[in-house]
């Protein structure tokens, strides 16, 4: 699978990343997704390494690092999982305050889905 966010403006990138993270955490809180799927898609060490190549605030890699801990919290402290997710959700929501989208700049969104992995051989 390949997920790609393409933005000409750093604030556009941060907005899309923030929204993706918020959706994942909210889906976990609402029990609409499972931890393994969300961690696989969003909260992995590779994501942190890729973010280091982009001039964004460290808070984004910190959030992804915190996301890598979700499975550990669920297994070691299951009673604290919702509190942990709510805290993560609040931190993500707080990031929107520092993002200023210019409505003058066109937004380019590219979606890529490789269907070949579903072909029966």
Which residues are covered by each model-predicted region?
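Acidic, Ser/Pro/Thr-rich low-complexity regulatory regions
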Residues: 1-121
């Amino acid at each position: 699978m390949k997920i790609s966010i393409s933005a000409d403006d750093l604030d556009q990138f941060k907005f899309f990343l923030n929204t993706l993270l918020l959706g994942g955490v909210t889906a976990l809180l609402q029990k609409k997704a499972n931890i393994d799927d969300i961690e696989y898609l969003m909260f992995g060490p590779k994501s942190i390494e890729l973010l280091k190549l982009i001039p964004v605030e460290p808070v984004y890699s910190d959030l992804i690092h915190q996301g890598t801990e979700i499975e550990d919290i669920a297994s070691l402290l299951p009673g604290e999982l919702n509190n942990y997710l709510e805290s993560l959700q609040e931190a993500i929501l707080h990031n929107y305050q520092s993002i200023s989208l210019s409505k003058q700049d066109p937004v380019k969104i590219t979606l890529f889905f490789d269907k070949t992995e579903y072909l029966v051989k």
